[in-house]
Amino acid sequence: MARRRRPEKREILPDPKYGDVVLSKFMNSVMLDGKKSVAERILYSALDSIEARVKRVPLEVFHEALDNVKPGIEVRSRRVGGATYQVPVEVRPDRAQALAIRWLIAASRARSEHSMSARLSGELLDAANNRGNAVKKREDTHRMAEANRAFSHYRW
């Protein structure tokens, strides 16, 4: 572990089409085996199909979906005197964003549509409307934290 200083955060360039940094992070998470052009094609085609289906700006739908999936609180394991407690802690904004991106992509990959772009657009639309597996994951996380509220004094 570094003793001296925290490494500075890397600057992520905004995506070429919409000029959005969060969308660029999402694209990097969709990417497999370093194939960014494939990830770009999947994401942009998903956003185009969202625009065709709901007649709204796809970037607004994307950010709405992301906000609906971001967790506010999560549980972390804390060992106290031989027992392990699930302690509820608040989620930092950067971690909340990373978790939301991860959950949206995992939920998309688990869907049954034919292409990844169709699965991604479906999951983003569901999340924007507070439905879908990614939103369910967030609600499960919040429910778990609520159930373990008694251990919140073990926070660190």
Curated annotation (Swiss-Prot):
**Superkingdom:** Bacteria
One of the GO biological process terms: translation
Q: Which Pfam families match?
A: Ribosomal_S7 (PF00177)
Cite the GO molecular-function annotations of the record. rRNA binding; structural constituent of ribosome; tRNA binding
**Keywords for this protein:** Ribonucleoprotein, Ribosomal protein, RNA-binding, rRNA-binding, tRNA-binding
Q: Per the UniProt record, which residue ranges are transmembrane?
A: none
Which family is this protein grouped under?
A: Belongs to the universal ribosomal protein uS7 family.
Q: What does this protein do?
A: One of the primary rRNA binding proteins, it binds directly to 16S rRNA where it nucleates assembly of the head domain of the 30S subunit. Is located at the subunit interface close to the decoding center, probably blocks exit of the E-site tRNA.
Q: What NCBIfam families is this protein classified in?
A: rpsG_bact
Subunit organization: Part of the 30S ribosomal subunit. Contacts proteins S9 and S11.
Please report the name of this protein according to its UniProt entry. Answer: Small ribosomal subunit protein uS7
UniProt source species: Zymomonas mobilis subsp. mobilis (strain ATCC 31821 / ZM4 / CP4)
Classification of source organism:
Bacteria, Pseudomonadati, Pseudomonadota, Alphaproteobacteria, Sphingomonadales
The gene name on file is rpsG
